[in-house]
Structure formats: C-alpha cells, structure tokens
C-alpha cells in the first residue's frame, strides 16, 4: 500500500512539475516580486517589459539564450537622485544592469530545480548580488527557497499559486531579503528604511502578455511585459503569401525549346513574377541549368523550391536533371542539383516525402562563373519588367520601392534613431527619411548611394563635448547627427569577385558611412566541410566632416581585421573573433557570440579587448574601459503576413566610446553569405523546400549539451555525502588550511611590496592578465565542452566548468563564514568579522584564484600537464599585486 501511495505521489509531483511557470519579477529575471526563483523560462524565450516600484522604474529584457542559461538586462531610473549634480537636464540617476542565471538541476519528482544567479556583473555594481535558489512545484503551488549575498542578503523565499480554473490569474507571496540600505541614495529616497519582509502580488497572464500588481510595505508596484517564443518557426500565419506556381503548361520538346525563344521567355517571366532576379537559363540535352536569386523569400531552399517548380512545369520534355545556382550579390554561392526530375515532380505532387527526395539532391558550394546564356532575353525584359511598389511589405510603416529584372533598385522609407545616456539628456532621438539607389553596372559591380532627410530630432540638445583622449572616431557622433538636415550618408562602388569555389572577395571605394570614407577590400574563405569561415578586411579611411557631404577632417587611419567565425555544435550558436587594428589605431580583439533561433531572430553580445587604454569616464586609469554591448537581428518576415528578407539590426552599448570601434562595412561578405550558408547547412538543406514544414522526420543532430547526463548530478549527492564523511577528505581540508595558515606569514611583506609597486608597468601587466584568466579559462572550457570532435577533451572541459562553478560557490560561502577584510580596506590581515550579511565583499578565499585552480586541475590531471598550475598561479599573483587579496586568501 505504501508503495502505491509513493508511486501515485511521484506521478502527481512529476505531472505538476510540467506546469511550473517561470514568470518574471520586477527586474526581468524569473522569480516573484523582487526575489528570483530556481527556474528559467523555456529555451528561446525573449521577454521585454516595464516595471515601477518607487523609487525605481526599469525598462528590462530577458532571454533564455541556451537551454539552461537565462540572461537579463535593465535600464534603471532612481527617482529623486540627480544623475549629475551640475546638470539638471539629465534628470534622475540611471544605471544599466546586466545579470544571468544558470539552471543546475531540472525539477524531478524527488528533487527541486536548482539555479545559480549573478546580478549586476558589469558596470557600477550598485545592485550586485549572487544567489542559489531551489524551486519545487506542488500542484498549483510553486515554491522557492534560496540564499544570497550582496544586495540579496541572506535567506529568501517565494511562492506562486496558479490554479488552472483562475484563467491566468495567480497569487504571489515572497520574503524579500534585499538590503535596501546599501542602495544608492537610500536615505534621500527613503528606501533605506525598508527592511526585509513580506511582499504580496497578483499576476495575470494572457498569451504572450503578462502583468503584476504588487504591494510591499503598503506601497504599490507594477510590472508589465511581453514574452515572445523565438524558437517558434513563425509568429503570424502567412495569409498574404503568394501561392507556389502550379500553372499547368504544354511543355515543348527539346527541339522546340532550342528554336523558339518564347519558351525561355515564358519561363523567365514566370520566375520574375515570383521575385527572382538576374535569371540565366541553359539547356544541354536532358539537363536544365538556372542561375538566379530571389529578393523577397528569406530562405534560399524555399526560393530554390519555387524555382524548381516553375522549371519543371515549363522545361523541355525529357528533362532528367535540374541544376540551380543560387547567387548572392551577383556571386554564385550554392548549387542545388536534382538528379531525378520525375522524383522531384512526385514530391511536389505530394506522392513522395522530403526524406525520400533528399538522397537525390546534392547541395554544394557553387563553382565560379556558373551562369547560363539567356542574357539577350533578360536584357529585353529589363525595361519591360521594371515595377514600383508603395506598401508596407518590408516592415516599414510605408515605403516606396522600384526594382527591375536585375538587381537595380530604388527605395525610400522612414527611419528612427535612438541614443541613450548622454550627460545632457538620457534620451535622444531623430526621425528621418532615407532614399537609396543601387545599380548593377556589370558582373559583380554595384553602385550605391543613400541620402537622409532629417524630419525631427533633439540630438542638437547634446551640449557636452567628447572627453575622450583617443581620436574621436565615435564620440563626436552627436555633432554628425545634429549638423545638416539633408546628408549624403553613403556613396559607394563595390566590386564583388568569386575567384575560386568557396572563396569570395570585395573591393570598395567611396563614402562608407556618415563618419568615414575611403577604400578597402575583403577576402572570405569557407572550408569544404568544417564549421568555420575566415575573412580578412583592410580599409584605408579618412574621417568625414560634419554636415554630411564631401568634406573630410584631418584624421586618417587604416583598419585591418582578421575574423574567424565558428559555428558551435549547439543549435544556432556562432562565435566570432576579430583581431587586428581598429578605428582609433588600437590593437586587440573583439569577441562576439550569437545565437540564431528558429524564427530567424539572432541575439548576441560583443566584448572588445584592445590596448586603447580608454581611461576617461566610465573608464579609469586603474580600469580602462573596454567596448561591449548586445545586439539583436529581427527578421521582419516572421512578424508579417508575407515573407520578406529585410532583417534590421539593433545594437546597444553602455557607452559610446572610441576604443575598439569598427567602421561600417560597405558590404561584409560573411554577413551577406551567412543566411544562405546557414540554410544549406541546416540538416538536409531543404527547409520549406516544398513550401511545407515537413522536417518532422529530420531530427536535429544531438548536441553536446543534449548528451550531458544532468541527471547524474543527483546521483552524485551520495558520493558527495560519502566524501564529506571520509577521513581522506578531512585530511585534505586540514592540509589546505595548514598551507593557508603557513602562507599567512607572507601576507604583510607581500602587501607592502604591492603598495610600493602600485601603478608600475609590471603590476598593471600582471593584474591585466591574471584577473582576466578565469574568465578566459571559463570561456575556452565552455567552447571545448561544446565541441564534440574530441570526446575526451569535451568531457574534461565540462568537468572544468563544473569545478569552476563549485569553486565559485565555495568561495562565496567561505567569504560569508570567514569575513576577512581585503588589503585595500586598510584594516590589516588579521581583521575578521565572520557570519555577517555584508561579507560578500570579503577577501577569504579569493574567488578568482579558487575558480582558476579548479578549472585547470581537470586538464592538468587528464593530460598530465602540471605546467597549467603555473598559469593558475598567475591569477594568485595578480590578485595580490592588485591588492585585492592577501597571499593566504589565494591559497586558502
């Protein structure tokens, strides 16, 4: 009987766990009101919202970037605290906060979900905290217990009651453990009087939309947001999408095709009506070749499928094979060969599946000069076919477009620019109209010009000049925005080349962008099968005058960047490293990481490390500023009733600085080719080929993340408990404490040495390298863990990540228990204040050193490379030289 009860409870608990919701708190992280939970949202969920709880208001966003990783960002306003003492125009103080959470354990019938999170990891650190939270579902009740350090000080709890019959309404209660006294301006705003306590709220969720009305100490707070599943294949049905070509025609014989040009012309006209451009046809015996591109349909495989339909309906009788060379910017990129035309027709007729068709299709990189000989017919259609459109089909409120049978086009559309965080005002904007014309003047040769008419703007209110000590390659941007209502923003000549299979090149000259013009070029190489691409770009540039016309400033520079793009073995992830010389003459590397979701949205971030030494605010001599930011590419076709290619890109950087900057490319080859490359490498390369979502029988290849035995973590609990009770473990702990105690004799002399050498070249170099080694080691271990080409290395790398995370958690716990002051506090090495809530900033043990040693140990043992411990010791030296820790902190 007891076994039956246990089984019933297990099934009930498991089923209820499936209903668990990960709703956002006022900071945007999955949680309750102010506190986080031990959950994260479903993979690919993007949320954006606004919250207000006096004195704070936030515009926030969050995304589940990976199946177990949730990231958050918010722009916080603190009411009643001036941003600048001598500048009332800026208004209240504002701060940018970046946070993240990792799901360590998924919920099971006997285990809660467990998550570790860090808040405010970059910037001012005003809201910095770290926490561990466990959540469990009990029917309609979701409950959380957790503990935090920093702003979240000590134990916290939360619960959400969401009965199905309430139709999206939920009741929320939490124990708020925030230490509001440490908040900026806590005395002036009155929030410093707020103590830890109970908060209550009512939630309402309707589809993608959600809201919360909360009360804390009798004061209301609100949170409203939208939640978008980026892993959905589409958001809006394509109600206005033109149907595929099904017009039945009398097909000519091969002799009729060769002698009567009307058949070629009819096929080209039919393709033109479906937005195909630069069409060239060639028939050789039983083989039909077509070279073309499509300017509307977003997936190359879908465009090729539509072209193949029309060719089958109008090709000569007896056609056995069809080859379609799909071009990008006039360059053939992918060749689709259909070896069995009859089987292809049966697929379009619904008589065969895509799985049956796929073995008879070859997709490869195109050879150079793969175009056919119907130029005369195409030239005759150029003037006849030129069409104009006035509509919103490309995602604009309205746009005027003109296009012909080639790649010539005219476009007039409105635009909006937004700028944050200038000291003379937090929000600046400009509304404008862009007029662009592009002309294909020859094979791969394009002429392009863009003008801008500013309709309205308040950028001219920017009064603070740039304080940058570097060449003002970006920080003078406000001068460019506010001078001249009519501007020539771009005037270019681009020549594209395709010298070899998988090799592409570009030569450019003219006005690249609003701030720079010059000459340059780029070469891109794709290997035959490897998941990476490599390009080199070199540009000789001169800075333009403000006003937007042909004048130039005296500043000239040459940028030279080599870029490696690597597609990680996890769905949609790409890592890019760009190394070389940037706009301000600084040398270094820009690291980028992004993920492409099934909807076509791309979300990513960048971080740049150069020798630019930007020490003006927000940088300091001790901590120079490094350019960083986040970006999102938005495929407008996913939000319209008709497919379209335009994909605007939004990029947000905390500050506009001159370090680590790049000029806008006249036509970045990798960006141009990436959509087609991604499409042709997506499983069998035939996504939506027949205008059908028929990939259900094409399961994605399991990734390393999929193969990780997360459940084994639960089984490891018994091993952990056994280890904690073993004599060997306590002997090792005792030896470690003994080493720390012995190293204590070095604390004072080492700190005196650090004081004497503060600011020296050696100290700066060691601190710069050693302080960043744990981050670099974690990043490298993460990439290697995802790379399944070497199972031994992948396993060691995942173990290193586990060890690093456990080391971080252990160091945080140790700081709380020991509470030792840091050298910079000036209290000496013997100042301890154990078990205090403020001990998150304590010194013993060093989190950097603990994590670094933990991460290198699995590699050192697996590959018998003890020299790696010397690399870890550099971090110890850096923490001491930077006066962040005593010697014994780094070995304890």
Model regions and ranges:
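Transmembrane beta-strands of outer-membrane beta-barrel proteins
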Residues: 46-48, 59, 71-73, 112-116, ...
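Outer-membrane beta-barrel translocator/channel fold
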Residues: 73-99, 116-132, 137, 144-164, ...
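Interfacial segments of alpha-helical transmembrane regions
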Residues: 786-810
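Membrane-embedded catalytic cores of phosphoryl/pyrophosphoryl-handling enzymes
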Residues: 789, 825-892
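Outer-membrane beta-barrel channels and translocator barrels
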Residues: 41-43, 66-68, 78, 105-109, ...
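Transmembrane beta-barrel domains of Gram-negative outer membranes and organellar outer membranes
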Residues: 21-126, 137-139, 165-169, 178-181, ...
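Short, non-transmembrane amphipathic alpha-helical segments
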Residues: 267, 298-320, 433-437
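Long, low-hydrophobicity, solvent-exposed regions enriched in small/turn-prone and acidic residues
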Residues: 22, 30, 57, 62, ...
